[in-house]
Amino acid sequence: MKAVFSGSFDPITLGHVDIVTRAAELIDEVVVGVAVNSAKNGIFSMDERVAFVKDAVADIPGVEVALVDGLLVDFCTEMGADAIIRGLRFGGDFDYELQMAHLNKAMSGIETILLPAGREFGTISSSMIRSAACNGGNVSEFVPGMVNTALHERFPH
């Protein structure tokens, strides 16, 4: 089985890495799709995000990284994926992800596998990391080392 785990990953967090690690234990091949999202104002370029994701998942067997520019279901078809992986944090993720799962299934027939966030990562989001980092917060326990370094360079305090 091959599955896609996608997101804007601006930046990738240890919660994302945890989902990829756990998905790779269950699924033969996992493609981490770094999505272009024109609706979001990112702090890192697409090239930087792809580099961060590649670095963060480099040691996880069966994982590759690719750029997603367009509909996720079209990307899944392109990649020959059987399923979409989505992580669920504490709070309101379930309702949204269930709606998206039904839409993706209706549009393409592709199934969605929902993985709950690990207890230590259930409240982490990229937007929270960006907010904390730009205000001088220490986010080192929530992001991979390469991302932490880049955040310190982007937001020196």
UniProtKB/Swiss-Prot annotation:
It is found in: Cytoplasm. Keywords: ATP-binding, Coenzyme A biosynthesis, Cytoplasm, Magnesium, Nucleotide-binding, Nucleotidyltransferase, Transferase. SUPFAM superfamilies: Nucleotidylyl transferase (SSF52374). ATP binds at S8, F9, H16, G87, L88, R89, E97, F121, G122, T123, I124, S125, S126, S127. Substrate binds at S8, K40, L72, R86. Its cofactor is Mg(2+). One of its GO terms (molecular function) is ATP binding. Its main location: cytoplasm. One of its GO terms (cellular component) is cytoplasm. Pathway: Cofactor biosynthesis; coenzyme A biosynthesis; CoA from (R)-pantothenate: step 4/5. It comes from the Bacteria. Its EC number is 2.7.7.3. It holds the Pfam family CTP_transf_like. Reversibly transfers an adenylyl group from ATP to 4'-phosphopantetheine, yielding dephospho-CoA (dPCoA) and pyrophosphate. PANTHER family: PHOSPHOPANTETHEINE ADENYLYLTRANSFERASE. Belongs to the bacterial CoaD family. This is Phosphopantetheine adenylyltransferase. It comes from Cutibacterium acnes (strain DSM 16379 / KPA171202) (Propionibacterium acnes). The lineage of its organism: Bacteria, Bacillati, Actinomycetota, Actinomycetes, Propionibacteriales.
